[in-house]
Amino acid sequence: MARPGQRWLSKWLVAMVVLTLCRLATPLAKNLEPVSWSSLNPKFLSGKGLVIYPKIGDKLDIICPRAEAGRPYEYYKLYLVRPEQAAACSTVLDPNVLVTCNKPQQEIRFTIKFQEFSPNYMGLEFKKYHDYYITSTSNGSLEGLENREGGVCRTRTMKIVMKVGQDPNAVTPEQLTTSRPSKESDNTVKTATQAPGRGSQGDSDGKHETVNQQEKSGPGAGGSGSGDTDSFFNSKVALFAAVGAGCVIFLLIIIFLTVLLLKLRKRHRKHTQQRAAALSLSTLASPKGDSGTAGTEPSDIIIPLRTTENNYCPHYEKVSGDYGHPVYIVQEMPPQSPANIYYKV
């Protein structure tokens, strides 16, 4: 039979294993490579900008570098814009300012956390399989900081395209354009930001027809694989939520069983003590063997004697009356000569 300490140790080990499995089941977030918002950054490709593929839980730092000796400081105001605004390089309507690069003496760092639900009312929230755009319509000078049209978005294609939850190796940009016809805004941006040397409209139609044929060709097609990937990632959120809820329920059950076990053990110990007390009292009430009553049962009760004054005899002490008839212990007293005895002559 295992000791109580060993049982407690085994329960805690099981709980720690379950918590470790729950922790390993959650996706591992990572910090993406920081982006320096400068016209000298070679990552901003002409006609495309910078395209990244973050996942839910990742973090991205956008850095406004400090002024360097011999170079003028670049002033920018960064916006989170809609696809049509990124295509037109316009932030006139409903601008969402993220950060302002206007402090030459220090480096400004703005961190974006890709999360589906933000605890902050003004926090950013992102959805899987959606595209988000960051750009600036400033021209780099202090006078052009508040520009709402053109700027480095148009002259240097300084924009960040964030494809949340998407795999860069799964499908090509052309397949994304044809496989998601409901996202008209995304299609508009992709068409507007194509390089000038892409080819004619006929070539583009031919590519669309090829992609549509691949989508209809069966389970091995790219469109079917994309759908399977979408359903898999959509089910991961529900899976993680179910695992977390299961861990909480398991811990609550362990706590409940522990409290119940302690109560049962306490009640059992109380009953054992009561039975032991009753047995000791019955033993004390049994007469001695040399008094000529060897055949008397141990359960015989000594009846208290009363004096003529209707008082209990002081030589008898009551032990207990909670379990039946009162039991008294006879105190052995030395014989005394009676005080008031009259003899008839």
From Swiss-Prot:
Residues 169-227 are annotated as: Disordered. Detected in lung, kidney, heart and testis. Residues 262-293 are annotated as: Interaction with ZHX2. Disulfide bonds join 64-101, 89-153. A motif (PDZ-binding) lies at residues 343-345. The modification Phosphoserine is found at residues 280, 286. Gene3D superfamilies: Cupredoxins - blue copper proteins. Residues 258-345 are cytoplasmic. The keyword Protein biosynthesis does not apply. One of its GO terms (molecular function) is ephrin receptor binding. A motif (Nuclear localization signal) lies at residues 259-272. Keywords: Cell membrane, Developmental protein, Differentiation, Disulfide bond, Glycoprotein, Membrane, Neurogenesis, Nucleus, Phosphoprotein, Signal, Transmembrane, Transmembrane helix. The keyword Phosphoprotein applies. Residues 30-164 form the Ephrin RBD domain. Glycans are attached at residue 139. Residues 25-236 are extracellular. Inducible phosphorylation of tyrosine residues in the cytoplasmic domain. Proteolytically processed. The ectodomain is cleaved, probably by a metalloprotease, to produce a membrane-tethered C-terminal fragment. This fragment is then further processed by the gamma-secretase complex to yield a soluble intracellular domain peptide which can translocate to the nucleus. The intracellular domain peptide is highly labile suggesting that it is targeted for degradation by the proteasome. Interacts (via PDZ-binding motif) with GRIP1 and GRIP2 (via PDZ domain 6). Interacts with TLE1. The intracellular domain peptide interacts with ZHX2; the interaction enhances ZHX2 transcriptional repression activity. Belongs to the ephrin family. This is Ephrin-B1. It comes from Rattus norvegicus (Rat).
